[in-house]
């Protein structure tokens, strides 16, 4: 089942690229591939959004220095037995009230937390930019690796096709020699088997080319990749003379330029700032406030009074000694409509302002725990920076050793290829005059093909290892890797 799925994938890739055979294929250079990836890769776009978030956080930190201003308004209905605030009487009625207000508050002192928070957000912007740069560098290396993989597979396919062409010519000549009785028919069968093996090797090599193209196209986030191809613009020469540097020189340069160290150092500074912010919560806070409010009622108001004709007097007491009733005129209030709302707002307005001091005494160890947690994070950041430095040193020395080994392997493979070519030429001369059988000649040919493939492999392996070493030395894959 797994084999069938793999074959289906290969067929789909072959079909997709095959349809474009008649179209004009664009050949991409390494620089074009890297720049396109930097502009379109999803991971890089996410890192760019992180930078934008960090900038927004900085604006929020600046806002902490500004006063907070809030306005409020309300309108309410009271239904049922309520006291009329105008007459003071209890009555069943529906009354309405409106109120508006505003408040202003500003922090005067908050343990310098606002200042330190602003400094932290500035560091966070730098850290997010370093993270974006690191992502760009990683994508550049991945693109370069995938690009060189395509070049290797294309060169390998070229060797396989050239070998098939040679075998087909030799097969045609061998048929003539068999017909002439110069060589036995068994040699002809061996050559046919060799040609068939060459055909199979070409199919495998073509699949490798197409799959490597697909891998790079996906890395570039290409929506249409059927016409995708690359052109070899690489050079085996060490143009920057990087191999003349010592590992310690490369490491010292890397400590100055490598983004992962800058990012770890910035994260350490952020952790230090977090400790200071957490300690600021131990200090008292002082703030100022100002409040304004006013209200209005929609109830009727007393506009005057009139004598109650039904009960013109009312008793208010007795004369001591005679118990004579003391009476006064009984007036009833005359109610009018509610006062104009804006007049009420103007008459009923009130203000309050002052200072508020808050001294932390005990908060369930929350402040102390936050300080301890921030200190743990600080220690973690210190260890991370130290680990990043050790990793960088190991990676530089490993990259230098790999590049040196790749160069030696490439030089050795070229010497081997030269020897295999001479051995093949000698075997061909002997085979052509009947002094060597087809089996031994095929062995010489196979060794030559393997030597050619090894030269190609070591060539592109060396180019990539040099790219990595230059990368640690501060030389980017392309001149400018940022947008």
Where are these regions (language model features)?
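Bacterial Sec-dependent N-terminal signal peptides
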Residues: 1-31, 41, 477-483
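Periplasmic alpha-helical coiled-coil/stalk elements that build and connect Gram-negative outer-membrane
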Residues: 2-3, 56, 138-256, 402, ...
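Bacterial Sec-pathway N-terminal export signals of envelope proteins
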Residues: 23-74, 80, 224, 231-272, ...
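Small/polar, glycine/serine/threonine/aspartate-rich low-complexity segments that form flexible
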Residues: 25, 72-106, 234-242, 289-359, ...
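Membrane-spanning beta-strand positions in outer-membrane beta-barrel proteins
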Residues: 43, 68-70, 113, 204, ...
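Membrane-embedded beta-strand positions in outer-membrane beta-barrel channels/transporters
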Residues: 101-103, 147, 251, 354-356, ...
């Amino acid at each position: 089942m797994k084999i069938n799925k793999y074959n289906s994938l290969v067929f789909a890739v072959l079909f997709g690229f095959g349809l474009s055979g008649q179209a004009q294929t664009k050949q991409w250079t390494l620089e074009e591939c890297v720049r396109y990836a930097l502009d379109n890769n999803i991971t890089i776009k996410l890192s760019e959004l992180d930078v934008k978030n960090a900038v927004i956080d900085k604006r929020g930190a600046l806002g902490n220095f500004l006063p907070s201003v809030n306005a409020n308004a309300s309108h309410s209905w009271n239904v049922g037995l309520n006291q009329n605030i105008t007459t003071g009487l209890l009555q069943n009625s529906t009354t309405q009230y409106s109120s508006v207000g505003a408040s202003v508050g500003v922090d005067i002192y908050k343990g310098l937390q606002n200042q330190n928070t602003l400094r932290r957000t500035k560091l966070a912007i730098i850290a997010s930019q370093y993270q974006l740069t690191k992502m760009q560098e990683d994508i550049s290396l991945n693109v370069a690796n995938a690009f060189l993989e395509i070049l290797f597979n294309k060169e390998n396919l070229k060797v396989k096709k050239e070998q098939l062409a040679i075998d087909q010519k030799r097969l045609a000549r061998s048929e003539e020699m068999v017909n002439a009785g110069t060589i036995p028919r068994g040699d002809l069968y061996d050559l046919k088997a060799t040609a068939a093996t060459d055909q199979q090797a070409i199919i495998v090599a073509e699949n490798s080319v197409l799959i490597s193209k697909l891998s790079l196209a996906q890395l570039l986030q290409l929506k249409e990749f059927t016409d995708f191809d690359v052109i070899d613009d690489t050079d085996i020469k060490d143009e920057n003379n990087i191999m003349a540097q010592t590992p310690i020189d490369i490491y010292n340069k890397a400590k100055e330029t490598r983004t992962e160290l800058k990012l770890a150092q910035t994260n350490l500074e952020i952790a230090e700032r977090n400790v200071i912010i957490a300690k600021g919560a131990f200090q008292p806070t002082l703030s100022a406030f100002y409040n304004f409010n006013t209200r209005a009622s929609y109830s009727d108001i007393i506009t005057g009074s009139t004598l109650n004709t039904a009960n013109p007097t009312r008793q208010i007491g007795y004369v001591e000694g005679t118990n004579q009733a003391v009476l006064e005129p009984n007036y009833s209030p005359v109610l009018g409509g509610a006062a104009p709302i804006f007049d009420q707002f103007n008459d009923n307005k009130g203000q309050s302002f002052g200072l508020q001091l808050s001294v932390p005494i005990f908060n369930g160890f929350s402040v102390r725990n936050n300080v301890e947690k921030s200190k743990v994070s600080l220690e973690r950041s210190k260890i991370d920076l130290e680990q990043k430095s050790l990793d960088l040193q190991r990676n530089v020395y490993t990259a230098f050793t790999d590049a040196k080994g790749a160069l030696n392997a490439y030089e050795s493979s070229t010497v081997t290829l030269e020897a295999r070519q001479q051995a093949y030429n000698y075997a061909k001369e002997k085979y052509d005059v009947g002094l060597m059988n087809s089996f031994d000649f095929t062995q010489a040919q196979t060794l030559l093909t393997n030597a050619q493939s090894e030269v190609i492999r070591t060539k592109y392996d060396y180019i990539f290892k040099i790219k990595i070493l230059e990368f640690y030395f501060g030389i980017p894959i392309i001149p400018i890797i940022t947008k």
